[in-house]
Amino acid sequence: QGMVDSEDLPLNVSRELLQKSKVLSIISKRLVRKSLDMFKEIAKDEEKFKTFTSNFGRYIKVGVIEDQDNKEALLKLATFASTDSGDEGTTFDAYKERMKEGQKKIYYISGASKAAAASSPVLEGLKKKGYEVLVAVDQIDEIALQGVGTFEEFAVVDAAKESADDADELSEEEKATKEDAKKEFEKTTAFVKEALGNQVDRVEISTRLTSSPSALVQPQWGMSPQMQKFMKAQAAAAGGDEMGMMGGMSANLELNPTHPAVLKLKGLVASGDDEAKDFSIILYEVAAVSSGYEVTDPAGFASRIVKLMGGEAVKAKPTAAKADDKADDKADDKADDKADDKADDKADDKPITPEVMEEN
């Protein structure tokens, strides 16, 4: 808190007239400029800057959102968690210094926690390239990052949106491979889209997935799963229609063409197997869970998973039981034979006496 004393302001009982004074506008601009200069000086001392950001970091981000005139200066002072920053935050300048050769974008992702966001399947391709990703764990972080647009010459994009596609970084050979996969799985993607209906906007072959079978990504102007949850909670608190507000927020489903599960689905579709529809829905629901979305039909999801697990168990159990029974029978036979042999040996070794003859 502070106070500004000025002899240039006219004395007036009307606060409305005073607020329109040009002198007040000049004072306001100078205060902002002097404050920014002070913040920049604090940023030169690492320990002081940590203390400053822990106390006022959120307000710096609010300034990034609301103060367009000073947005660039404030953005250089804002700190965000990242996949490479450990427990400390990072500034955009520090991020830029760590960017990999050939990296053309600055990436960020939102999540309920840093660990949850960092484990999202949409980051697999970026991790493989060694790219650092900023992590927004608070609504203020996400709103601030959404409004950045560009930092210097780099576009700032949400890694969980289609705008983060790395098509501009692919070689000619990689582009050709992508087109071949798209044609090869054309029938499969069309089938999955029909099976899911309005739950997804599009079903596409992914270049960003390396180990997961599927993932959900938002279109360029879509809301992240965390922002959707936040908006639903706000609508519910205000007594509004949360489902109406979130209508039309379907995501795109991306499939990994090299994953065994997707290859199995392709085979099921090609053979016209009835299991293909349930398999498609499971891939979608797995993508929803791993990408941070809520499964709209938890009971159905559980039922499909149990059905899949149960089908495998029924085939495996008789075989295992039969093997166990066979092993038990073999052990019993071996024990009986051993006991008989031992009894025979004992009988043979026993001397022949009148008593033995009487027993016989």
What feature does the model see in each segment?
Residues Q1-N360:
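Conserved GHKL (Bergerat-fold) ATPase module
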